[in-house]
Amino acid sequence: MGRFSNADGPGDDADEREVTPALTVGEGDIDASLRPRSLGEFIGQPRVREQLQLVLEGAKNRGGTPDHILLSGPPGLGKTSLAMIIAAELGSSLRVTSGPALERAGDLAAMLSNLIEGDVLFIDEIHRIARPAEEMLYLAMEDFRVDVVVGKGPGATSIPLEVAPFTLVGATTRSGALTGPLRDRFGFTAHMDFYEPAELERVLARSAGILGIELGAEAGAEIARRSRGTPRIANRLLRRVRDYAEVRADGVITRDIAKYALEVYDVDELGLDRLDRAVLSALTRSFGGGPVGVSTLAVAVGEEATTVEEVCEPFLVRAGMIARTPRGRVATAQAWKHLGMTPPAGAGGLGQVGLFE
């Protein structure tokens, strides 16, 4: 269990967690410097890479644009990197926007009108695009044209505008939130899975080389297994461990240095942080293992219900620590054991398989 207290509280705000898969403030430039530039450099997701290579090579051989591409999966797995790689492999320009930024049809029309033939348009969080913009996107994806409405009321007229043939790459963390008509217009859909520890070790070795960090193999394995199967988290933890190694040691990251550093940053051997352990502690100590509703659990740890449900719970469920039941959240036998406690009778049937076991 390491040197963590079972009674750890939630600590820092959820947005400041070292193990959040989302980009944090000021992280964008560093994240960009570590991005792979080609499919050959991209580590992990072998099926997606193979399928994408076929799609892109086929389009290049035909001298046309590939089908529109939808990339789905949890944050931090490389969807934006793949969009950049797609444009690079095609020798095309990449235009970047996001679903929340496209609030009106006019916003999208302006972007589409500036595309040149062969451009790649990347829309991140495409499930959050506003309905008027989405409906305009249908026609652009299918027929490479848009209808722009001029005026209001009975006097309004629709002016058709041609759009240069382009490839849309959409990224989403919630593919189920896409409307059927939008989803059906993507010719190729790829789902990205969490990484295995061995793949994360390769990611870390590559990043260490780029950043000039001396990282031992055992140290890389130590960081990888605490990274929640997510390259972005692995790279962030690598930078935190580097800071520790430079300040408290000689700058070389050994396994012991990695362990000590990650304990300082409250990331335990399974990748749980203070907030995760606070949720498990409340569930086991305050509510006897459950079942308990997420709102009640959130009050117990001093967080918003959405934070517990959307930030903590997905990983705890995936790691086999919490089970969702019709009556509420229940701690599994593995959760009790991780906190150094004896699970009560009946907890053993609620999933004891860990994330990478």
From Swiss-Prot:
Belongs to the RuvB family. One of its GO terms (biological process) is DNA repair. Coiled coil: none annotated. It catalyses: ATP + H2O = ADP + phosphate + H(+). Mg(2+) binds at residue 80. Residues 1-27 are annotated as: Disordered. The gene is ruvB. GO terms for cellular component: cytoplasm; Holliday junction resolvase complex. InterPro entries: AAA+_ATPase, AAA_lid_4, DNA_helicase_Holl-junc_RuvB, P-loop_NTPase, RuvB-like_N, RuvB_C, WH-like_DNA-bd_sf, WH_DNA-bd_sf. Signal peptide: none annotated. GO terms for molecular function: ATP binding; ATP hydrolysis activity; four-way junction DNA binding; four-way junction helicase activity. Residues 196-266 are annotated as: Small ATPAse domain (RuvB-S). The RuvA-RuvB-RuvC complex processes Holliday junction (HJ) DNA during genetic recombination and DNA repair, while the RuvA-RuvB complex plays an important role in the rescue of blocked DNA replication forks via replication fork reversal (RFR). RuvA specifically binds to HJ cruciform DNA, conferring on it an open structure. The RuvB hexamer acts as an ATP-dependent pump, pulling dsDNA into and through the RuvAB complex. RuvB forms 2 homohexamers on either side of HJ DNA bound by 1 or 2 RuvA tetramers; 4 subunits per hexamer contact DNA at a time. Residues 269-357 are annotated as: Head domain (RuvB-H). This is Holliday junction branch migration complex subunit RuvB.
